[in-house]
Amino acid sequence: MPRVVIVGSGMQYSYRVIDLLLTFFFYSGLYGLIAAKTYLQVTDPRYPSNQQCENTDDVPQSFQRPRDTRSTHDDTDLLLLESGSSLGGTWAEERLYPNLLSQNSEGLYEFSDMSLSEAMDGVDDEGQADRDTPVEDRFIPGWKLSRYLTAWSRKWNLPQYMRFNWQVKKISRLPTKEWELGIVIHPDQPSQTRHTTILCDKLILSPGLTSVPNILNFSPASGRPSAPAENVIHAKEVGPWCRDNLGYQPIPGQDAHPSPTKPSRVPRRVAIYGGAKSSFDLVHMFATLHLKDPSFHLKGLDATDSIEPVQVHWIIRDGGSGPAWMSPPRSNMPNGQSIASDKVASTRFVGVLSPCTPLVPKRLTLRRSSNFLGWKLAVEGSWLARLLHGNPIGRYFVRRFWKALDKSWGDFAGYDSAQHGGKMEHLRPTNSIIYCGAPLGIANQRGFWDAVRAPNVHIHRSAIESVSGDASSKGVIIDLADDTTLPLTDLLIQATGWKPNVPVEFTPPPLTLQLGLSCRVPRAILTPTNSAQDVKVDPEIKKLIHYWDGIDSVSASRIRRVFGPNSSPPKDVVESTTAPTDEFEFSPYRLFRRMVAPELVEEGDRSFVALGFVLTATTAVVAEVQALWAAAFLTGGLDDTRTHDALSINAMSRSDVDRDVSEDVVWGGLTGVGPGVDTLNYNDMLLRDLGLSPYRMGGGFINELTSVYTPKAYRGIVEEWKAKHGRP
């Protein structure tokens, strides 16, 4: 077994490692936490022990035992590394901002073994804005999710494995098949920053899709100075800005960030750049700041002082995907029942109606066989898919359904209103909801559209041309591409989303692609031109990209043949009018089941898994099933050929795995769905791989079709899988 030399503060220590589960960067979001708990459940029959251990900066004692004192009965050694200062990922305390709400209502963002109300322990928000809404339909404030994840991690004794402020900078694969991690440890005192290297046998990455902010660099206008750095921030930094300037207290009753002694600095003008859901939230927050909503937890604002409404300039470029569609907070089920909109989306009913779900229509097909012909006839696919998507009449009615939804959501928002200077027309989404690439969100803030329609909100459909400083003040001057210059602005917030790559250096460079991860490569390589031959890039990277190009071409032909019109966006989709200007682009993730690298699968290597590289409206419903699949893969549970109703990954050829991965990538590209998945369809596939039934609701076909799948539908799947495989 490997030994680790950890270098820090001029001293060397030697530790013993059996397994190191690393989930880095945002490990402590949903995916990382449930992965750690599930892996320990699968590998250690005594987990969780009753012993409660708190987080420490030390290496666990089990790492210090000499090699010859370890036995096969020792507990699994496990570490969870986090570059931030607290757990929670998106819901970490340092990332919360005043009106941050989950896109999930109560019951949909929790683990199956512990409800959100259990973690609250009687604590409630004195300023909660939706007390008249039934509890099960309330959208969850960010602070509650932060508190929930902390309580749940304590229940499963996870703090003892956590290491905060440990940033993984480099990952290498050694000839011994170990993983080498270069780490920078950032303590509270910058002068104490140190570097170290550790080794591990098994590695899980769970940074998710929101780890690297997409920060745009704006040049100043000619003859003007650059804008002050503190006046141009990303949406990720809004929470710290609110703590410093408005006395924001993220967790009610917890004085971790006391109100500032200096007077609060309420901005006069704020500019917000972007059209995704986060931009809607930020516009709402600043537009209603003068109302001093107690649910914002702004302790720096004196309740007796009058505050002028903040002038909010909302800038959305005129090209690209446009503003997001915003669903009403409640929607109707087929039986007429009105429930939270996110719960409607967590039913099979919506999945089968969506053209974004790759459901094969029922059909006869030829499959390879061991008989003398080498082929056999087989029936595959879904009758519902044949009825709804496999014929012109079905597609017509599906299209009518989504067009009716367009009108319903548009009427709710008031896009056609001639009032307010017609500014609501600027927020009309570019494409229909039926287009899989259309950005979506839920208008779950109180008085959401009223705040947007208010006279202190100004909407501009143009790109930012330049951002400059002002010599006589600390404000910024923003020039737009349509020749508009905004009034002097105190704060520019980039609600520009996230980059799709993992923020770690992999060595050698081709390792990134070999692990199935996204890699920043020259655009000319991804879209070959005559000049592509002149682009300097690692030969192995170029070889891998061209290898996948050939497979993708075959996959595209097959998908168009099987899915017909559903394999492409509707004819009325408006393409982006903004030509790409960056000479680099990110290659797609190529992960089998969105988790494992095809190259490692072929080699029989069960040491690496990536989690959270799926885009879904119901993260918690996916996370628990993904975690079990990952644990099964890492421990050889998917190599078992004795269970005939489960996946035997050893029985799959490399070409089978590559075809599956390629079709997943090509489907995302052709339809516009990208990394998005239909939650229940994806979970069904993983559960079938594990030999478990995907149908968890019972009560017959209609009940299965219309019931809301919450995480509790998957309660007990770890024990169910262990029993099926004879594991203690």
Swiss-Prot record:
Binding-site residues, FAD: 168
Top EC category: oxidoreductase
GO cellular component: membrane
Residues binding NADP(+): 490-491
Record's keyword annotation contains Transmembrane helix: yes
An MF annotation (GO) of this entry: monooxygenase activity
Residues that span the membrane, as ranges: 17-37
Segments of skewed composition (Polar residues): 50-64
Cofactor: FAD
Ligase in keyword set: no
Topological category with respect to the lipid bilayer: Single-pass membrane protein
Top-rank taxon: Eukaryota
Subcellular location: Membrane
Coiled coil (UniProt feature): none
Pathway: Secondary metabolite metabolism
E.C. no: 1.-.-.-
Keywords: FAD, Flavoprotein, Membrane, Monooxygenase, NADP, Oxidoreductase, Transmembrane, Transmembrane helix
InterPro entries per UniProt: FAD/NAD-bd_sf, FMO-like
Family: Belongs to the FAD-binding monooxygenase family.
Described purpose of this protein according to its UniProt entry: Multifunctional FAD-dependent monooxygenase; part of the cluster that mediates the biosynthesis of a highly modified cyclo-arginine-tryptophan dipeptide (cRW). Within the pathway, avaB uses the avaA cyclo-arginine-tryptophan dipeptide (cRW) as substrate to generate the cyclo-Arg-formylkynurenine diketopiperazine (DKP). AvaB also catalyzes an additional N-oxidation of the avaC product which is followed by cyclization and dehydration.
Name of the featured protein: FAD-dependent monooxygenase avaB
Gene this protein is translated from: avaB
